[in-house]
From Swiss-Prot:
Residue runs in coiled coils: none
Gene3D superfamilies to which the protein is assigned, alphabetical: Homeodomain-like (1.10.10.60)
Record organism: Mus musculus (Mouse)
Biological process, per Gene Ontology: embryonic limb morphogenesis; positive regulation of transcription by RNA polymerase II; proximal/distal pattern formation
Protein name: Pre-B-cell leukemia transcription factor 2
Any one GO molecular-function label of the UniProt entry: RNA polymerase II transcription regulatory region sequence-specific DNA binding
Amino acid sequence: MDERLLGPPPPGGGRGGLGLVGAEPGGPGEPPGGGDPGGGSGGVPGGRGKQDIGDILQQIMTITDQSLDEAQAKKHALNCHRMKPALFSVLCEIKEKTGLSIRSSQEEEPVDPQLMRLDNMLLAEGVAGPEKGGGSAAAAAAAAASGGGVSPDNSIEHSDYRSKLAQIRHIYHSELEKYEQACNEFTTHVMNLLREQSRTRPVAPKEMERMVSIIHRKFSAIQMQLKQSTCEAVMILRSRFLDARRKRRNFSKQATEVLNEYFYSHLSNPYPSEEAKEELAKKCGITVSQVSNWFGNKRIRYKKNIGKFQEEANIYAVKTAVSVAQGGHSRTSSPTPPSSAGSGGSFNLSGSGDMFLGMPGLNGDSYPASQVESLRHSMGPGSYGDNIGGGQIYSPREIRANGGWQEAVTPSSVTSPTEGPGSVHSDTSN
């Protein structure tokens, strides 16, 4: 802007300044009659004022086309103009009138509760703040919740958890640093711009602080999105590596084999004693409570669908019979049958052991001829096979009216069925 923005001084030494821009004829800035001070009548009423306003508007429209050097030159001319203090005082008066409405609308906004929750979670997981082993603490807590010591597999998984948590922490801090850097750069740019404008128009320090808070609120949306995505990544990581319920759900194949073998060999009374539970827990590498829960669930599933588990019972019957036959190969007397026999399905030996011919073993191979001959020898005339008379090694036991298990009146080693598989009730005991 040049001197024309503030209005040229009137001819003849009249009052100059802002009042002359767009003054009407007969006003305080022009003599009556709209002519020259000398009394001439050649002037057009209001013509010069309209021309000045048109020139000002034209200059405003061309501001965006100015180069940086031209803008600096015009800014310097404005600051050096003799009417600059008067213009600044007028702007201050206008600001005082409108300042009340600005102050009344300015209120301190409370901290977002969602942002506080995200910050607390990131601190608890060891992602935000100084690294104090938050991931290790979370892994240890999950291991304690699983109800047992830390096995080698668990220790490997916990090591993977800590490694991936460190990656999440690194990504979070690097992105947060980029966000803070961008926010600081933009805030600095705005503050420099306001300081430069304060030389032309009144800008209070409180207004600068308010503008900084507005900028931070705008950037806080990016910060919240970053923290929320980081929390989601941590929760997914915890569900994959530290879910205690998933650890309790799966047993190893060897542990399941040991538990099933005990269950079907004690099918007449599948309630292991505390000593037996401790022994099974030691063999399987699990806790006593897990053994109790497994037997309770197994009894319920077996009674609800006895036909489904008949094939599984037959497999364990074959295993037991083969082990008995191998143990009695060197003796002339018949082998001793299992102490607590009984199974969900019938298994006819027919006294000769011919049924084992051509039957695949548990691992997919056929039984050797030596084992078959040994079994025939042990199941020969007058032996255990004739005693049961083509009966069953394992047979379903009677079930009490209240749904419990009942011992048969026959000897504990060999029994015959008294009730078909259809008579099944749900097990309500533990």
